[in-house]
Amino acid sequence: MAKSTQKHAILTLLKQASGPLSLRDIASKINHEASSRTLRRWLADWEAGNKVKRSGAGPSTTYQAISNPAEAVPPFSASDSFAFLADLDPDLRRVLLNQIRDLWTHSSTALEGNTLSLGDTHFILEQGLTVSGKPIKDHQEVRGHARAIEVLYQCIDRPLSHDVIFALHRAVQTEYLDDIYKPIGAWKVEANGTHVVGSDNKQSFIEYALPLFVPKLMAEVLDAINATSVDDVTLDNAAVIYAKIHMGIAHIHPFYDGNGRIARLLANIPLLKSGLPPLVIPKEQRRVYIETLSKYQISIGQLTSTSGVWPAPDQLREFEAFCASCYGSTKDLMEEIFKLQRKRAGKGF
């Protein structure tokens, strides 16, 4: 059966089903003509496109077609939500949003080791093609991050919820694993940590929050994001607000993987809601970025339900300064686009 025919058959199956179906149910009904990995990829794409709703986690995950438009995420209009797009012609708005998407996606995935260049990223996202000689994994990461940005944009006009965070995680985690110890779209179930070498050449092991404490700690992060008023975020303090949220999520490390990309996405929510462009950490600053994160986390120690997410806010100053130094690339893109807009206005277009 051709791929397009398979996909159509599965969507029809979900629409006609009397209730939610598990991955095993779907595979059985199509006589296992598509692999579990392929099915997960298609289902994730449909979920991001508001065609399918996912419930549960791990082996108990089920899928159901969205038949009621009220269940779907409403269409997103960037021109209505982002003040940094104001006064731009529609075509220039699209150009700027695509430039930000490409830069944000390239930078965030490159910080995690992705080998695709900015040009490669643009080519993949604009043309939908592959770059010869580059790993499929890298292509999937780029497409997944771009999809996550769309999910974020669609939800920017409502309070952040666990469901949105889990949807973002499913978008960025493009390696589909049937492993109960590596849940996708759910909090981690095993303890995690990382071995680092600081700028002083001293080796350390950072222990992230235990799975037991993740729900309460992430609820604190959610509350902080939702409590941030759009009137409280300005160009002058945007990096400080971004740094606090980013550090909190990175220090909790709530997922088995994908924590950095999720932190960099969620930390931009207050900025975007306030009409500011996202803060993008350049890949060239990767070492300083990791060292600054690690220095704070080693100093604070492992987070618990009693410590809270930010037990010593004063120690965030170095990371705040680092983030402020990174808040330039998207502003530069804006300036170039507005130069074009002013040029058009001067010519009477």
Please tell me what each predicted stretch does.
Residues 1-349:
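FIC/Doc superfamily catalytic core
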